[in-house]
Amino acid sequence: MMKGDNFQTQNTFHGILPTLPYLNQYSEEFNPSDLHQKISLIEDNSLDLWTDSYNEGQLMNRLIQTARIANEMNNISARDKIINTIQERLEDWLTYESNEVAFLFYYNQDWTSLIGYPAGHGQDTNINDHHFHWGYFIHAAAFMEQFRPGWYDDWGEMINLLIRDAASTDREDPLFPFLRNFSPYA
């Protein structure tokens, strides 16, 4: 331990690629037919396989990456089918209909938190990992806006609630705590 009243860290940010390039022109071992076969397997993922806020987010992320690969390979049919699946599922989570019992968010006033139901990995009982769970949904929203410009106009308010639940930057936010999941080292 060192004694002091402050410290400083500095990291260099090198940027993030939104997607990797199509490898056909960069690798002799690359086999497009293998990739098309994998796309076919993933594009037919049924909604019945999906389970809870965490695992469903992971599956949406897998579909997002597959749609990006299909797009790079000019497999527009597969890309659009996957986008439709992502859109259907994401919008189902972002809405509530009377008597709906699954795939929804609700606000718990006692805990000042959004809860996804069905919840996974203690997201409801321990109020943990919202930045992971909601991060998948936020990523899916960014993906939707990239491929369906204007999507955010209809759904942005709900996406902003997810962002605020995980990391509200407003110290006076009436719904969520300030920087719930903030880590200066993350």
Predicted regions and their residues:
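Inter-helical turn/loop segments and adjacent helix faces that build the functional surface
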Residues: 70-77, 144-154
